[in-house]
């Protein structure tokens, strides 16, 4: 079993801080109460592919919990849990994409977007509303609308900005086997 490396610990701390900043200053209200278009999830998805499920899950959990505590006075745990779930779920494909090796193919981009769409749909349309009802006794009609809006906006945001982050980063990496020894 791999141990948690110093690089992953640093990535978790910096990632959580960036998540908070993006959630605070780069979010666009949707008109649905307590629901915004969040660029932080594009960053979370990028970190998930770069560092894997544990680091990304922690970034989502810690970043969202601290953001809620700073902005609202206390975390809204049902959505904090889903942020961790989203990071963890997307991070599960990190070994299949291998972003550090460069060579981000169309197939890998499709895998990334299919995965993030499924994970976010499950998280925001199912898990978050059900936990809102169970933990906070919120009205079902309200939380399922919030969940659907969050899912749609986050899937689109990650699909556009997250994909751009992956493509841009992959261009900075040398492809495995691309260097040849001169005679």
From Swiss-Prot:
Q: Membrane topology per the record?
A: Multi-pass membrane protein
* Membrane-crossing segments per the record: 9-29, 42-62, 74-94, 117-137, 147-167
Q: What is its main location?
A: membrane
Taken from the UniProt entry, a GO cellular component term is: plasma membrane
Pfam families, alphabetized: ECF-ribofla_trS
The alphabetical list of record keywords is: Cell membrane, Membrane, Transmembrane, Transmembrane helix
What is its subcellular localisation?
A: Cell membrane
Does the record carry Transmembrane as a key word?
A: yes
Keyword Cell membrane in the entry? The reply is yes
Q: According to the lineage, what is the superkingdom?
A: Bacteria
Instruction: Tell me the protein family, please.
Output: Belongs to the UPF0397 family.
Q: What is this protein called?
A: UPF0397 protein EAT1b_2102
């Amino acid at each position: 079993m791999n141990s948690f490396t110093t690089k992953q610990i640093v990535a978790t701390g910096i990632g959580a801080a960036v998540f908070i900043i993006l959630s605070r200053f780069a979010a666009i209200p949707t008109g649905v109460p307590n629901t915004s278009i969040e660029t932080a999830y594009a960053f979370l998805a990028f970190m998930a592919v770069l560092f894997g499920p544990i680091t990304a899950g922690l970034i989502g959990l810690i970043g969202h919990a601290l953001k809620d505590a700073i902005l609202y006075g206390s975390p809204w745990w049902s959505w904090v849990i889903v942020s961790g779930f989203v990071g963890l779920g997307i991070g599960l494909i990190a070994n299949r994409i291998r972003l550090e090796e460069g060579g981000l193919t169309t197939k890998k981009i499709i895998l990334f977007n299919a995965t993030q769409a499924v994970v976010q749909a499950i998280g925001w349309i199912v898990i978050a509303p059900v936990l809102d009802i169970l933990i906070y006794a919120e009205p079902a009609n309200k939380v399922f609308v919030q969940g659907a809006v969050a899912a749609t906006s986050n899937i689109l945001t990650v699909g556009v900005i997250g994909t751009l982050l992956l493509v841009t980063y992959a261009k900075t990496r040398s492809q495995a086997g691309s260097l040849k020894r001169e005679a």
